[in-house]
Amino acid sequence: MEIDYYDYEKLLEKAYQELPENVKHHKSRFEVPGALVTIEGNKTIIENFKDIADALNRDPQHLLKFLLREIATAGTLEGRRVVLQGRFTPYLIANKLKKYIKEYVICPVCGSPDTKIIKRDRFHFLKCEACGAETPIQHL
């Protein structure tokens, strides 16, 4: 009795060919620039805020709204930077950005950063473009 099993390499190649195009060619390309934080008087400025939002593939207003709620302050988006009322350490800002990435960027099913936020009726979902999973998220 002879069974014709697929060779592992052939199965792996077949699986690779069926991956979406945006997933195939990335290695560990998800790199978020560190926040360039400066404190001027009673204001904290994140100089590269727009660059961070672009790296996360998120609307800067959404990221700003999250950040303002997390640190309980007021702030404005001015061009490529954000001005926050109050003095906040770079460590605090970095931790809040990590929390945002965990909750609103990284797919909880497969761990891919290739996600987008979609709205269906009154609910918001994190839709993964790599595995197709849709995970409900808290609306800001």
Curated annotation (Swiss-Prot):
Keywords for the protein's UniProt record, in alphabetical order: Initiation factor, Protein biosynthesis
Pfam families attached to this UniProt entry: eIF-5_eIF-2B
InterPro entries according to UniProt: IF2/IF5 (IPR045196), TIF2_bsu_arc (IPR004458), Transl_init_fac_IF2/IF5_dom (IPR002735), Transl_init_fac_IF2/IF5_N (IPR016189), Transl_init_fac_IF2/IF5_Zn-bd (IPR016190)
Source taxon at top rank: Archaea
Family the entry assigns: Belongs to the eIF-2-beta/eIF-5 family.
Quaternary state and interactors: Heterotrimer composed of an alpha, a beta and a gamma chain.
Record-linked HAMAP family: eIF_2_beta
Protein name: Translation initiation factor 2 subunit beta
